[in-house]
Design a protein with these regions (language model features):
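Catalytic-domain carbohydrate-binding cleft regions of carbohydrate-active enzymes
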Residues: 1-233
Length: 233
């Protein structure tokens, strides 16, 4: 719970990850795991990246804690060295460690979403400066450089296995890194589902072919329940 960014299975819940992966593959299944570009500031991987100047510091300076109550931040994916280190940490703790048993990567929060429900000006402050320049100029491209880290990282280790990434944010040209994008966490309302159809069409018209959505919604929306009950009566 308190080791976000360690890329390690929690031993109490997953005592034998290799056996779990092997059993999934024995049933002709495929295994995808969610990995965020996020690190609590107490974990080893954070400290390794931070020692090279590859962590964003504003969230730490502002003492921002996430919904679990811990403090952390995101790595600077615009740095080639940071991308290589990020992949190496994933490889050592997940990919090569478990005999290439991870078949796909769910790269969540790749907007980047350092903090939920945050004005754009503060999102940029939390996500920079980057190795390329200000986050005002480069913010939207985070998803593609993060995808670069995993795609080229996995190919360098095991060029014979197909790479597949599911991302929560997209950018022009990102399909070159074997990505599919879904539209993120939506409410369980019909109007939200309809809005995703429009979003998906526009996304695909930009030349990005693989897109999806939370078909059943992600979060229950209660704002209109009381009004609906009044109408029903």
């Amino acid at each position: 719970l308190d080791s976000w960014g360690s890329h390690e299975f929690e031993a109490a819940r997953y005592p034998n990850p290799q056996a779990m992966l092997d059993s999934v593959h024995a049933m002709n299944g495929r295994f995808m795991i969610s990995v965020w570009p996020k690190f609590y500031d107490t974990v080893k991987n954070y400290k390794e990246l931070d020692n090279r100047g590859w962590m964003y510091h504003q969230a730490i300076k502002d003492d921002i804690h996430d919904w679990l109550g811990f403090r952390g931040s995101f790595y600077d994916a615009y740095s080639d060295g940071a991308r290589k280190m990020f992949w190496r940490q994933m490889d050592e703790n997940l990919y090569t460690k478990y005999k290439f048993g991870i078949d796909a990567w769910w790269m969540d929060a790749s907007e980047p979403n350092v903090r939920d429900c945050t004005p754009m000006w503060y999102r940029k402050a939390l996500s920079g400066p980057t190795a390329l320049g200000t986050s005002t100029e480069y913010f939207n491209a985070y998803s593609i450089v993060n995808a670069d880290a995993i795609y080229n990282g996995q190919r360098s280790v095991n060029p014979n296995q197909r790479v597949f990434l599911l991302t929560r944010s997209g950018f022009a040209g990102e399909q070159r890194y074997s990505t599919a994008t879904w539209s993120g966490d939506i409410a369980t309302r019909w109007e939200d589902m309809r809005a995703q159809m429009t979003a998906g069409l526009n996304y695909s018209m930009a030349g990005l072919p693989f897109w999806g959505m939370d078909q059943g919604g992600f979060c229950v929306e209660n704002r209109y329940v009381a009004a609906q009950q009044e109408f029903d009566r």
